[in-house]
């Protein structure tokens, strides 16, 4: 089971109470995890809750599962494409929206090494970080701006579908076969691959598939 952390407080905790009681009624031994993408090598502030459970008859204690973590040794810029199509750069309207004082105040940081949570329905596909770059070419390391829209370069751009997938742990071998908007939604709704891999490895080590 996977969900956002806020689910635990939904309806003053009653929703989670019902769900957990159902797990118990189905005779499962289970454990609740709160896992951050940054603890698994992905530079994105994305925390999700997971429930790992086994039928009581299997005799497996979920508390014995050890999830392998990975030190964060990369930054957002390491996940960006070198060459980006012009269509991903915002026009004047988008540029003014993300650089206005009110929008900037909502952003946690500038030149951040970790991206904010990728959402499926975010306007302008904003990753939450702004980087000041003096490069006079159209090749930018991230969403960048120089302070004013000049219609040629120094404008802000959104993350590409490939960059969003990378920030979710997908390798470039993953084929993009749907339009950009659908890909943004799929990436935002996905589970970080690195986290899921660690969970699966932990489950396999319990020997559950040998029983």
What are the functions of these language-model segments?
Residues 1-125, 132-138:
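Class I S-adenosyl-L-methionine
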Residues 88-211:
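C-terminal target-recognition/interaction regions appended to catalytic cores
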């Amino acid at each position: 089971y996977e969900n956002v952390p806020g689910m635990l407080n939904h309806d003053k905790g009653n929703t989670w109470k019902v769900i957990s009681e159902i797990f118990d009624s189905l005779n499962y031994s289970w454990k609740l995890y709160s896992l951050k993408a940054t603890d698994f090598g992905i530079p994105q502030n994305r925390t999700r809750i997971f429930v790992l459970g086994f039928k009581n008859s299997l005799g497996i204690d979920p508390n014995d599962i050890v999830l392998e973590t990975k030190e964060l040794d990369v930054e957002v810029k390491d996940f960006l494409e070198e060459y980006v199509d012009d269509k991903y750069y915002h026009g004047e309207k988008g540029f003014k929206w993300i650089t206005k004082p009110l929008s900037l105040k909502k952003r946690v940081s500038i030149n951040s090494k970790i991206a904010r949570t990728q959402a499926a329905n975010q306007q302008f596909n904003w990753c939450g970080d702004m980087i000041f770059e003096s490069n006079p070419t159209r090749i930018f390391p991230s969403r960048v701006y120089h302070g004013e829209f000049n219609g040629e370069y120094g404008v802000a751009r959104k993350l590409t579908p490939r960059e969003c997938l990378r920030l979710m742990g997908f390798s470039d071998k993953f084929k993009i076969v749907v339009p950009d908007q659908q890909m943004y939604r799929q990436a935002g709704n996905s589970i970080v691959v690195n986290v899921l891999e660690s969970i699966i490895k932990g489950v396999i080590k319990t020997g559950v598939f040998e029983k």
